[in-house]
Each structure stands twice: as C-alpha cells, then as structure tokens.
Amino acid sequence: MTWSQEYFVNREDVRLYVYRKRDAAPQVGEAAKPVLLLVHGSTVSGRNTYDLQVPGGKDYSVMDYFADRGYDVWTVDHEGYGRSSWSGRGNSDVPTGAQDLAAVVPFILKETGAEKINIFGSSSGALRACMYTEAHPETVARLGLSALVYTGAGSPTLEQRRKKLPEYSTSPRRKVDLAFYEGMFNRDKPGSSEDSVPKAIAAAELPLVSEVPTGTYVDMCANLPLAHPEAIPCPTLVIRGEYDGIAAEPDLLDFFARLPTKDKQFVVLSGIAHNPMMGVVRNKFHHAL
C-alpha cells in the first residue's frame, strides 16, 4: 500500500495540481529518497497518465511501480488539464508547460529535501521536460524521454495531424471523449493495448474535463524543433516504441547523437506503440526506465 498526497502550487494566477506517491509517509529526519517527476503529454492529465487504475488490470500505475522501489514520485497536471486551473490566456503550449515545471520543481525540492530530481516525460511531456532541463540543468540529475519528437521528420501521425492545424491554431481548446481516447490507442497498432485502458481513462478524465488545450498539438505540428539536445548536459535515456507513429527512429537518432553527455542510452521496445506505460507489454517500459 502506497502513501499519497495532493498539493496545489501557483504559477502566477494558475493553480497547478500536484500529486505525490511514496511507499510510506515521510518521517521527520529521514534521508531524502530519490525523486522522480513524471510529465504528461497532450491529452491526459498527469495523475490519470501515471497513476491510472484499470479495472481488472495490474501494474498500470507508473507511480506505484517506482514508489514500491524506493522513489518519491510526483506528477503535475499542466495548465488547463485535469485538476489544474485554466487562465484563459494562450493555449498551454510546450513553453508554458516548462514554466509549470519551473514553478513546481522548487516546491518538490523543498518538500523532499532533495537537491535534484529525475524527470521523465512522454510525447509532448518529453518536450516540456527537455525545455525545463535546458533552462534549469542544475536541478536535474537524469532525464528520461519517450515518444519524443525532434524535428518531426518522418512522423506519419504529425503528417495527419497537420491537416487540422488551422482548427487547432484558431481555438485554444479541443474536445475529448471516449471515442478520442480509443482512437489514441488504435492509431499506431491495434491490439498493442487492452480495450479497457481508454475506458479507464475516460472514467477518470471526463468527470474533470471535456476539452484540453491545443498548444502542444500546434507546437508539434508547426514549431519544431523545440528541444535542443546540445543544451542538455545530464545523463539521458531515449525510449522509442516499435510502433510509435510520432517518434520516427531516424529523427530520434539524430537527437540522440547531438546529446553531449556520454552517459546516454537509446532503447527501442518491441510491441509498444505511442503510450508505453499503458501497453500490453508495459513491463518492458518499466524495466527500461
């Protein structure tokens, strides 16, 4: 049984929902545990990405997995997602997400007593994590990335998404529903995840939101590259799912080659599509991270 706690951290007038899990409640005077901050993508909030509870399923919660292994695990809902507030300004793009992280990380360091965090992001969350690390390298021990897009070259998903770029560019939010979540998991490789997963996401997300921001979609279609590997000094892990339609392998290898650190790994996981933590073979993702 894990211990959990909810917080709110302010970035200007935006209230950011922050969620934490450990194997037990913190005790006065104890040594700091290693901290892992998990950064969500374009559609599903932090808690419902990384602490998803799937009826009849097991090991879907990345937070539980790493809490059980001694980590102090955190996630945040970015502006306009989940339980966080929405200012009505902008569209919660990738740079705004990096600003969210810049507001949250000092709070995490104060609460935990840690000097640095380990940070992992998936999809547009990987871009947010990169941008944060570039701006605040002194706070990041290790960086993990999955479903990353660098220049966007060779990405069939982005090629299709660009057809709706005029719509995304003129509206700050887009609608989500069960059908949309189901499409997310059938887009790359039908059968790579259980049908119960999008249903569990809908049950968790739709009581909170019926729309999510468009900013990261616009950024990934029109404003790449947003990550600058030459400016990332820390040890870095890049994970690509075999069937991921966003993360084209040559594009990622170009990113990987530009990382200055010699402490780096590039991992391709067979049987996995765009959402590695929610696939049938999610144990491979857990092992890699």
Regions found by a protein language model. Name each.
Residues A25-Y71:
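Short, surface-exposed "cap/lid" segments of acyl-processing enzymes
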Residues A98-K116:
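Conserved acidic catalytic loop of the alpha/beta-hydrolase fold
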